[in-house]
Amino acid sequence: MVVLDQPAQSGMVVALQANYLEVELDQVSELIPSRLLCTRRTRLSHRGEAVYVGDRVRVEAIDVSHARAVVADVEPRVSFLTRPPVANASTVVVALAVDQPAFDPDQASRFLLTAERTSLAVQLVLTKTDLLEPEALERLRVRLQAWGYPPLLVSTFSGLGLSELKQRLAESSLSVLCGPSGVGKSSLLNALIPELDLRIGSVSGRLQRGRHTTRHVELHHLGAKARVADTPGFNRPDLPDDPRNLEVLFPELRVQLEQHPCRFRDCLHRDEPGCGVTRDWERYPIYRRAVEDLLGLSRPSRGG
């Protein structure tokens, strides 16, 4: 039966299931289940107000016997990621494999650019480190540090780095774990939270692409106060709309501009005469291609 005299409860959306929202309540009670399957108030839809995993919400009309309720209001968000869609995250963890699938600098940069666009803390994690010889792994670590991302090296096979990763995730209220398919995100979460027992996929030998095992965003507890969002893998994040926004998304370019500001406000740091940006950093060709791609997309097509 619906408990009409129960006061409204606050909680967090921890998963989406078809047209339903799974909400975990803040206050544990013997009278009310800790998790409720909820619909949305019609007025939220009329206002065009979407509800996402990570949203803080108020639920009412609680049906104790069936663990159902209705989301009545959504609290203002402190942050929002568009892909994967997660509200109120504090850290973005980009997971990239050193092998199987092979490390791809262009793909890695796309994910790091997407993470930088959130203005949240970014942590780079290299997975499957047991597949590389120590010398090769050290070269990759130094390389990524030069990009501006000191990586955390982990292996679910040897256990390398798992304790440090768990500690760092526990320091963030909500971390979003993202990365290409097949890099081992589900394996990582299984190692960090064994009771999850998430399904693990494999990597296509021909395409070197992982097979999606996570189908939707879901939050999992990691310690008393921290949560981590498991997200579906995808292989080609989008670039920002405006090429002028790219310069703040590359840490190595940001450092250059802080030390030696370019005298041209609208400079894209390509071949502009007098541009003070040097070209002797590894990802400059990636930056350059991204600018060219965006300029190509922004040009109006000429009809015949």
From Swiss-Prot:
Subcellular localization is given as: Cytoplasm
Q: Which residues bind Zn(2+)?
A: 262, 267, 269, 275
Which processes are annotated in GO (biological process)?
A: ribosomal small subunit biogenesis
In the Enzyme Commission scheme, what number(s) does this protein have? 3.6.1.-
Q: Which cofactor does it need?
A: Zn(2+)
MF annotations from Gene Ontology: GTP binding; GTPase activity; metal ion binding; rRNA binding
Keywords, in A-Z order: Cytoplasm, GTP-binding, Hydrolase, Metal-binding, Nucleotide-binding, Ribosome biogenesis, RNA-binding, rRNA-binding, Zinc
| Alphabetical list of InterPro entries matching this protein | G_CP_dom, NA-bd_OB-fold, P-loop_NTPase, Ribosome_biogen_GTPase_RsgA, RsgA_GTPase_dom
Q: Does the keyword Nucleotide-binding apply?
A: yes
Q: Where is the CP-type G domain?
A: 78-237
Give the residues the record marks as binding GTP.
127-130, 179-187
Q: Cellular component terms, GO, for this chain's entry?
A: cytoplasm
Q: What class of enzyme is it?
A: hydrolase
S-adenosyl-L-methionine recorded as keyword? no
Q: How does it assemble?
A: Monomer. Associates with 30S ribosomal subunit, binds 16S rRNA.
The entry sums up its family as follows: Belongs to the TRAFAC class YlqF/YawG GTPase family. RsgA subfamily.
**What this chain does, per the record?**
One of several proteins that assist in the late maturation steps of the functional core of the 30S ribosomal subunit. Helps release RbfA from mature subunits. May play a role in the assembly of ribosomal proteins into the subunit. Circularly permuted GTPase that catalyzes slow GTP hydrolysis, GTPase activity is stimulated by the 30S ribosomal subunit.
Q: What is this protein called?
A: Small ribosomal subunit biogenesis GTPase RsgA
Taxonomic lineage of the native organism = Bacteria, Bacillati, Cyanobacteriota, Cyanophyceae, Synechococcales
